[in-house]
């Protein structure tokens, strides 16, 4: 109460901040006459002037007022549109490393041109990030006219581009692209073998459009580059037949309650757990089929992989429903449906064997599992930028998360014109059937007066169910869901047309404005090549229809179910009432809806019982709306905790990733790594000697024979260490260490002299990079295994996060030691007699790189989701010749086994 009183007197932080920016906007407005007086050439020349002023030491803040005035005037000349004062304020918020919440239709795309221009003047590059290729292409094409008029270059970074095309895109002053593509390019650059293979510049400034979608909804979905592993698809098929033999139990076993089912389903946390009875039943079935040894448990160390497959099959059958979480295409592919947008995600795959389990369940071809080669979460990728900003229509409900995780403050920008949309209260019915019938009954009279209607559903299944009801009621409508992805923008653009009814899955079509009366440009395009008179007639017709739609009450939004997040509901409502237009919205709910059933059922159902509701009756009361909102807050809090927990774990691997990538880039960018190799050489041989001749030890503790054998076996260094001890009775361990290192170095230096420092230097870099990549890949797999079982430490009264940090650090230190040793082993054993043979080895390495089969993936941790854009991946490598076995003779003709020769380089 006191806080509210103080806010009323001095205003909120948001109000005070906006008040300060309004003063700056007034200064920009004062420059308008001056800018209008300039010719096109004089206005363009301002860009060169600003760059010179920055080069001489002026800050961006000093030139902001003038730069914004230049962009505003250029926008008017190029587009015939000028930024409103609220858009100037939005631009300043973005420049100030904050999130601008701007309502739908307030011109976020035009707002972003202001800070993009200002920050591009530094020459370090600006990235404008959107959620899909369509929006990236559309915005780049449109805004390029403005930026090129002002003398700046624009690039576009989308899937399927070559390395040269991407380098050109990143070299531009302003680059548009998707979050996936920027993230994958970062990972690919850090897997490159040569500096010229990289495509990106430094990560300077990013503006994220629909920032809530990317930094919140996709925060749990790391980007992964992976390669195939040797998996057995038959196990998935076998286990798929086991699950139908199990029965579900309503709740978990406790001391007081022992059920008769085999597994329980926790819808709230999206988990399935075998009961003790179920575990025993599954073990018996698996033992009968020869998949599990007798007297062995599913939970024994040797059966962990089998348990992993059983859990995946259980989840596939109980938590993942066809036409809700995924669809099956005509080609027999299981394609994931994005739970937030309702779009299909071709090429993306769930991880942890879940996708294979779903494929087995649907009876389609089962693809192999993959091994992670490189990964990063969006949370950690975007925190790499020096400056980061974002814009969206719905950020305020997630302001705390933006601030605590990304350090981004959310500023709510006022609308240019007052919002007059009427938001009706929630109507709650007992059953889904009653709810859908009520929606159809509500739509009929509104259609008679020509009011356009947009119906939002949560799944493909529900959109098709509602579509069938409308067909029976003879209501003409369009359906937009994951199955009609290509028509998305067109359908949404015409959703505001007179008398149109559109059913859309969740927030499909986000980023496309719904104009009352329909999209005029699209209507004119359909006319084709017609006379100016016909074009004018079409425009007049559109104006008439626009007036009728306004009179009918504007766009009516119908929500068929509350989402887990209030923000998603607000996004749906936000499609109506743009730029001061009239509009209406209402949510229809039932006690059978997921959110109501799982989170809000008890309170609301008790309320409905007290009211004595009958079939077909609905309840509308502020108490009900409050109960639903409280349920949503609970879910939002739980989801935030999950994302925060993910970040805590990923921060551990993120620090390790930085070290590895820094090492790789240091190797690539150095002309030679002689000093690094010498240091590694000293460390490895010192450690080797210390194992057999411990420091400050007695002669009796020495194992000189073991040292000789180790030096010869691992490094091909044949030294008479025992003879040294016989020849010199006073020989100290320090002297042994020095002599071993000296002889080993001399042997390697002789090899370098033989082929020349340039060739061996290039070879050293190649060995170093390939060894880093191999061990990093193995380390990522070890980290995955560690993480999957770390929660069990809680039962031993230990903090799983602290244990994960400690053990992963130990694994990392061990990996760094292994890296040094592996490099020295390979360099010691390699036999290069001539320049020609060195060239052969280099060529083999290049061929290996060319054949590398990589898949870009995007994995959702809470559901085990992995995503791969099939347009970005290389074609699958098919081996034409027999693979060389590790113990077979090396094909180079050296006479050695493959694993001891060129197999070391694989």
Curated annotation (Swiss-Prot):
Reactions catalysed: ATP + H2O + cellular proteinSide 1 = ADP + phosphate + cellular proteinSide 2
Basic and acidic residues bias locations: 876-886
Keywords for this protein: ATP-binding, Cell inner membrane, Cell membrane, Cytoplasm, Membrane, Metal-binding, Nucleotide-binding, Protein transport, Translocase, Translocation, Transport, Zinc
An annotated Gene Ontology molecular function: ATP binding
Region of interest (Disordered), ranges: 860-906
Feature: compositional bias, Basic residues: 896-906
Cited Gene3D superfamilies: Helical scaffold and wing domains of SecA (1.10.3060.10), P-loop containing nucleotide triphosphate hydrolases (3.40.50.300), SecA, preprotein cross-linking domain (3.90.1440.10)
Primary location class: membrane
Positions annotated to bind ATP: 87, 105-109, 513
GO cellular component: cell envelope Sec protein transport complex; cytosol; plasma membrane
Family annotation (InterPro entries): Helicase_ATP-bd, Helicase_C-like, P-loop_NTPase, SEC_C_motif, SecA, SecA_CS, SecA_DEAD, SecA_motor_DEAD
PROSITE patterns attached to this UniProt entry: SECA, SECA_MOTOR_DEAD
Cellular location(s): Cell inner membrane; Cytoplasm
Enzyme Commission no: 7.4.2.8
Topological category with respect to the lipid bilayer: Peripheral membrane protein
The protein's required cofactors: Zn(2+)
Single GO BP term: protein transport by the Sec complex
Top-level taxon of the source organism: Bacteria
Task of the protein: Part of the Sec protein translocase complex. Interacts with the SecYEG preprotein conducting channel. Has a central role in coupling the hydrolysis of ATP to the transfer of proteins into and across the cell membrane, serving both as a receptor for the preprotein-SecB complex and as an ATP-driven molecular motor driving the stepwise translocation of polypeptide chains across the membrane.
Matching HAMAP family: SecA
Subunit structure: Monomer and homodimer. Part of the essential Sec protein translocation apparatus which comprises SecA, SecYEG and auxiliary proteins SecDF-YajC and YidC.
Name this protein carries in UniProt: Protein translocase subunit SecA
């Amino acid at each position: 109460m006191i806080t509210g009183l103080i806010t009323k007197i001095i205003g909120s932080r948001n109000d005070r901040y906006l008040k300060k920016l309004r003063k700056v906007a007034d200064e920009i407005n004062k420059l308008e006459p001056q800018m209008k007086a300039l010719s096109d050439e004089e206005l363009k020349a301002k860009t060169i002037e600003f760059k010179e002023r920055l080069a001489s030491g002026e800050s961006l803040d000093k030139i902001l007022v003038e730069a914004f005035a230049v962009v505003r005037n250029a926008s008017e000349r190029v587009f015939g549109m000028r930024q409103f004062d609220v858009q100037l304020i939005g631009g300043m918020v973005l420049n100030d490393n904050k999130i601008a919440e701007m309502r739908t239709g307030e011109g976020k795309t035009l707002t972003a041109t202001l800070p993009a221009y200002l920050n591009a003047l530094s020459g370090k590059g600006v990235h404008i990030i959107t959620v899909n290729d369509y929006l990236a292409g559309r915005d780049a094409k449109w805004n390029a006219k403005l930026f090129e008029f002002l003398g700046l270059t624009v690039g576009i970074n989308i899937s399927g581009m070559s390395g040269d095309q991407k380098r050109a895109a990143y070299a531009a002053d302003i680059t548009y692209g998707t979050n996936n593509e920027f993230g994958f390019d970062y990972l690919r650059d850090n897997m490159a073998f040569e500096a010229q293979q990289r495509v990106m510049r430094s990560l300077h400034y990013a503006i994220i459009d629909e920032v809530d979608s990317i930094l919140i909804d996709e925060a749990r979905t790391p980007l992964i580059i992976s390669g195939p592993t040797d998996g057995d698809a038959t196990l998935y098929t076998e286990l798929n037949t086991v699950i139908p033999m199990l029965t579900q139990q309503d709740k978990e076993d406790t001391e007081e309650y022992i059920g008769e089912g085999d597994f329980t389903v926790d819808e709230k946390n999206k988990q399935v757990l075998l009961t003790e009875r179920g575990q025993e039943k599954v073990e018996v079935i698996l033992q009968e089929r020869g998949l599990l040894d007798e007297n062995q448990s599913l939970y024994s160390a040797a059966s962990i992989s089998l348990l992993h497959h059983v859990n995946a099959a259980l989840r596939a059958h109980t938590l993942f429903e066809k036409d809700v979480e995924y669809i099956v295409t005509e080609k027999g592919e299981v394609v994931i449906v994005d739970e937030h947008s309702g779009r299909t995600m071709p090429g993306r795959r769930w991880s942890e064997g879940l996708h294979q389990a779903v494929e087995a369940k649907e009876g389609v071809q089962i693809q192999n599992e993959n091994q992670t080669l490189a990964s990063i979460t969006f949370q950690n990728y975007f925190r790499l930028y020096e400056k980061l900003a974002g814009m969206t229509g719905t950020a305020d409900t997630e302001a705390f998360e933006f601030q605590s995780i990304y350090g981004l403050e959310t500023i709510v920008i006022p609308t240019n014109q007052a919002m007059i949309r009427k938001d009706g209260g929630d109507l709650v019915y007992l059953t889904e059937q009653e709810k859908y019938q009520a929606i159809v009954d509500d739509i009929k009279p509104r259609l008679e007066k020509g009011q356009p209607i947009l119906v939002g559903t949560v799944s493909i299944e529900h959109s098709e169910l509602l579509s069938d009801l409308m067909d029976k009621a003879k209501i003409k409508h369009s359906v937009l869901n994951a199955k009609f992805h290509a028509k998305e923008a067109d359908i949404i653009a015409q959703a505001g047309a007179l008398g149109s009814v559109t059913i859309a899955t969740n927030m499909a079509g986000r980023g496309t404005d719904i104009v009352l009366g329909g999209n005029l440009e699209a209507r004119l395009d359909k006319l084709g090549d017609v006379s100016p008179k016909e074009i004018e007639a079409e425009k007049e017709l559109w104006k008439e229809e626009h007036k009728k739609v306004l009179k009918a009450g504007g766009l009516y939004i119908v929500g068929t179910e509350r989402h887990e997040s209030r923000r998603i509901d607000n996004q749906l409502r936000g499609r109506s009432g743009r730029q001061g237009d009239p509009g209406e919205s209402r949510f229809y709910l039932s006690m059978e809806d997921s959110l109501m059933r799982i989170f809000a059922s008890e309170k609301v159902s008790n309320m409905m019982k007290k009211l004595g509701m009958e079939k077909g009756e609905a309840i509308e009361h502020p108490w009900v709306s409050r109960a639903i909102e409280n349920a949503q807050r609970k879910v939002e809090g739980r989801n935030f905790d999950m994302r925060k927990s993910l970040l805590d774990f990923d921060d551990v691997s993120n620090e390790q990733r930085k070290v590895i990538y820094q090492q790789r880039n240091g190797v690539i960018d150095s002309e030679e790594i002689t000093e690094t190799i010498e240091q590694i050489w000293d460390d490895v041989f010192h450690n080797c000697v210390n194992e057999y001749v411990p420091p400050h030890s007695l002669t009796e503790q020495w194992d000189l024979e073991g040292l000789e054998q180790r030096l010869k076996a691992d490094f091909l260094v044949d030294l008479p260490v025992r003879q040294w001890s016989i020849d010199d009775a006073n020989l100290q361990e320090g002297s042994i260490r020095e002599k071993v290192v000296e002889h080993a170095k001399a042997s390697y230096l002789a090899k370098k002299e033989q082929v020349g420092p340039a060739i061996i230097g290039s070879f050293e870099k190649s060995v170093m990079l390939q060894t880093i990549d191999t061990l990093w890949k193995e380390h990522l797999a070890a980290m995955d295994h560690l993480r999957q079982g770390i929660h069990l430490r809680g039962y031993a009264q230990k903090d799983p996060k602290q244990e994960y940090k400690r053990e992963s650090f130990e694994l990392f230190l061990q990996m760094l030691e292994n890296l040094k040793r592996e490099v020295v082993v390979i360099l010691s054993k390699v036999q290069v007699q001539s320049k020609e043979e060195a060239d052969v080895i280099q060529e083999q390495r290049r061929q290996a790189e060319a054949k590398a089969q990589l898949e870009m993936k995007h994995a959702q941790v809470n559901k085990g989701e992995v995503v791969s854009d099939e347009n970005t991946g290389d074609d699958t490598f098919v081996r034409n010749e027999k693979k060389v076995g590790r113990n077979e003779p090396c094909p180079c003709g050296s006479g050695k086994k493959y694993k001891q020769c060129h197999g070391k380089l694989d």
